[in-house]
Amino acid sequence: MTLTTRFAPSPTGYLHVGGARTALYSWLYAKKNGGDFILRIEDTDLERSTQASVDAIMDGMNWLNLEWTHGPYFQTERFDRYNEAIEQLIASGNAYRCYSTSEEVDAMREEAKAKGEIEKYNGLWRDRTDHPADKPFVIRFKNPLEGDVIIKDMVKGDIAISNGQLDDLIIARSDGTPTYNLTVVVDDWDMKVSHVVRGDDHVSNTPKQINILRALGADVPQYAHIPMILGDDGKRLSKRHGAVGVMQYRDDGFLPEALLNYLVRLGWSHGDQEIFSREEMIELFDLKDCNRAPSGFNTDKLIWVNQHYMKTMDPAYVAEHLAWHMADQGINTENGPALADVVRIQADRVKTLKEMADISRYFYEDFTELDAKAVKKHLRPVVKEPMILVKEKLAALTDWSPEPIHAAINDTAVELELGMGKVGMPLRVAATGGGNSPSLDITLALLDQSKVIERIEQALVVVEARIAAG
């Protein structure tokens, strides 16, 4: 039988980092074992499910390049199948109609609480046949009363739950729509899911689902419940901690490889290794090596991983992602250096691609004003002579590349008996609009020669104005 995993998000919001990690672990385990990975959209909550959320989930999966073998399947397209399963359970005596109102069930729970017993439905309609003809009803699963359910969890080890602790859960609402614990069981059965990887907040559902699977005569998959992700305050990660949807990390300038690498280490490790290629993840990952304790989300660590990938990946590939940020910031890159060249000189100067796009604007756009602090510090009256001379030397170059450019700047400094900084810094402000840039000769080489001369002339106008102002 083919090993099969699945990722089954509910489209009630964006794809968050916890869901993305679950998807990654499921995808990796299937890949490692030559299996199938299913994408299933659990959209039976008709009031909260939205197409926008479906789109956000799909966008996130595609951006992370977690390709699925089968799907996406939508639960709303399978109601007939769920009804078949419900009828099967009723026919086999494993489910029944319950006519108790919600108020009556609440009273049952309160009574149990007062007696110090487990708060659950008391099974009033479990074996009754005197069904009223004019009252609404739900369908409940007839949970076994004796014995234990053993979850053989690949992460947590064996977990035993007494059937006496479990409720006769509702598997169909009064309007006939199936509930989560029924639909997920039928889907996993029909789709031949062999390994269920999900967050440990689902542990409480697992014994109920195992009992339903057995009542249907279905195989029980192996389970792996991975621990939750915590914020820096030790509480479950949420928006309050800065947790955002996967696509927000794209928008903020992170590479998908960086986010995947960071997520795989949130709950799994291989010695002290921090950086993993996709191929290494597939080769080394094993659910049995996942931690049992929760992991803490650290944005600074994610930034460090992102910087590593920006600096070490093929600049042409990084440039493909940088292009999105350039367009997002309204920067037209048709006229200017190749983005891969920009990546080569900027990658070790920034934390994110968004930042890289922002500081690289001067390669593609003329600026209407210079940085005020840089002007005050570097475009003083004394720089007029070196600016004029370096402009002449740069204009005379027939080879517009870093080495001749560097020689022109150096010759200007030597000729006027100045330090390189006395020539280079005013030139940097003139060419880039500010006081920070990569190596000046390389920066100028990526700019058009005539553009550099034009910008020096504009900077000289500023210098002349300062001279005139005294």
From Swiss-Prot:
The keyword ATP-binding applies. One of its GO terms (molecular function) is zinc ion binding. SUPFAM superfamilies: An anticodon-binding domain of class I aminoacyl-tRNA synthetases, Nucleotidylyl transferase. PROSITE patterns: AA_TRNA_LIGASE_I. ATP binds at residue 239. Its main location: cytoplasm. GO terms for cellular component: cytosol. A motif ('KMSKS' region) lies at residues 236-240. It is an enzyme of class 6 (ligase). A motif ('HIGH' region) lies at residues 9-19. The keyword ATP-binding applies. InterPro entries: aa-tRNA-synth_I_cd-bd (IPR045462), aa-tRNA-synth_I_codon-bd_sub2 (IPR020751), aa-tRNA-synth_I_CS (IPR001412), aa_tRNA-synth_I_cd-bd_sf (IPR008925), Glu-tRNA-ligase_bac/mito (IPR004527), Glu/Gln-tRNA-synth (IPR000924), Glu/Gln-tRNA-synth_Ib_cat-dom (IPR020058), GluQ/Sye (IPR049940). It is found in: Cytoplasm. GO terms for biological process: glutamyl-tRNA aminoacylation. Its EC number is 6.1.1.17. Coiled coil: none annotated. Keywords: Aminoacyl-tRNA synthetase, ATP-binding, Cytoplasm, Ligase, Nucleotide-binding, Protein biosynthesis. Monomer. HAMAP family: Glu_tRNA_synth_type1. Catalyzes the attachment of glutamate to tRNA(Glu) in a two-step reaction: glutamate is first activated by ATP to form Glu-AMP and then transferred to the acceptor end of tRNA(Glu). Belongs to the class-I aminoacyl-tRNA synthetase family. Glutamate--tRNA ligase type 1 subfamily. This is Glutamate--tRNA ligase. It comes from Colwellia psychrerythraea (strain 34H / ATCC BAA-681).
